[in-house]
Regions:
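Acidic, metal/ion-coordinating pockets
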Residues: 6-7, 16-343
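N-terminal Sec-pathway targeting helices
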Residues: 1-11
Length: 343
């Protein structure tokens, strides 16, 4: 009898070992997802008065370097072509930056430059082509422009910590004479068009994107609240599966909207710029922490001193965050001059 019991026990042991040996160790203990931290800034313009200042101090992000160089990804709106071209477009205001200062962006931790805006074509197609060449040579990715509209609307795919991030970028402002967009046969930037945006979102999904971020150059200058086009496009993006929407162009910080559990930042304002109006010199840099289906956004209020950003002191930052909340439909918690939004 004892012998039978021993034999039965051995059989069950073998069966049990066989079962557990086929289990994937990763299935037995669920590991928490690693957070992904992404920094976003508003307009970075390295031309006009900023360009000569860069010869004196080539590190425009010196005072916020922990924000731009301390996360998994940093995304800026590059508001000036990087070119030596001497052939500007015939328009009132044109910007360009010395190509040597592309390195200033790389040294600051900039990973992605958004190119779809109303100044990227200031120095014609050559200016755009030079910008792309200089960014590539420095190891900075770009989105929102290209040799044709298909490439300009191509989602930028970035793999971070086992997750796939897709960035889609376009500009509201397109004009055949002053700021010509990309076409089927012409280089340029991606002009806002819902059909193209939806197609880009679909392509990002097909590419296996876990998080789709839409970034737009849109809105009215010096206006703190979104217009109907901004709201309509942003809501549609969320409806189609975008994780969040980030905007710039108004030169002032805009309101923040939570829509169906996702955040829309209608304007991050300026970051590196030479505008003198006090309202255009108060802005923010945001750091988005994504984990699973949730996000925590930290808002860092900045002042532009000279032409470069630096963090506000606590009292000014708290006042800024109170004002920002007034223009938003979200609660902004503040601690030590830093705002926080959870979704």
């Amino acid at each position: 009898m004892r012998k039978i019991i021993i034999i039965v026990a051995v059989v069950f042991l073998i069966i049990g070992l066989s079962y557990f040996s086929h289990l994937n160790p990763n299935d037995q203990v669920s590991k928490p997802e690693k957070p992904i931290n992404i920094t976003f800034t508003g307009d970075v313009m390295l031309g006009r008065n900023v360009n000569p200042a860069l010869y004196e101090d080539p590190q425009p992000f010196r005072n916020v370097i922990n924000l731009t160089n301390g996360t998994d990804l940093t995304v800026i709106n590059l508001e000036s072509p990087i070119t030596n071209s001497t052939n500007p477009r015939d328009k009132l205001i044109t910007f360009k930056a010395d190509p040597q200062f592309t390195k200033s962006l790389k040294d600051a931790g900039v990973d992605v430059a958004c190119l779809a805006n109303n100044h990227i074509m200031d120095y014609q197609e050559q200016g755009l082509n030079d910008t792309i060449k200089n960014l590539k040579a420095t190891g900075i990715m770009y989105v929102g422009a290209g040799p044709n509209i298909t490439e300009a609307y191509k989602p930028l795919i970035i793999d971070i910590k086992g997750k796939r991030i897709a960035i889609i970028q376009a500009s509201e402002f397109a004009d055949e004479y002053y700021m010509p967009p990309a076409t089927r046969n012409r280089p340029g930037f991606a002009p806002i068009s819902w059909d193209h945006i939806k197609s880009a979102i679909d392509n990002a999904k097909k590419a296996g994107a876990d998080y789709i971020i839409c970034e737009f150059h849109y809105g009215n200058e010096y206006r703190y609240t979104p217009n109907e086009l901004q709201k309509n496009i942003s809501h549609k993006c969320i409806d189609e599966g975008a994780f969040m929407v980030v905007g710039h162009h108004p030169h002032v910080p805009g309101g923040i909207e939570e829509y169906k559990g996702h955040l829309i930042f209608y304007s991050l304002g300026n970051c590196v710029f030479d505008m003198q109006n006090p309202e255009t010199r108060r802005s923010m840099i945001i750091v988005v922490t994504i984990r699973g289906n949730t996000s925590i956004v930290h808002i860092y209020p900045i002042n532009i001193i000279g032409y470069y950003p630096q963090l506000m002191d606590v009292d000014d930052a708290n006042a800024f965050l109170d004002e920002l909340e007034y223009y938003s439909n979200v609660e902004i918690q503040s601690k030590n001059g830093v705002g926080m939004i959870k979704t």
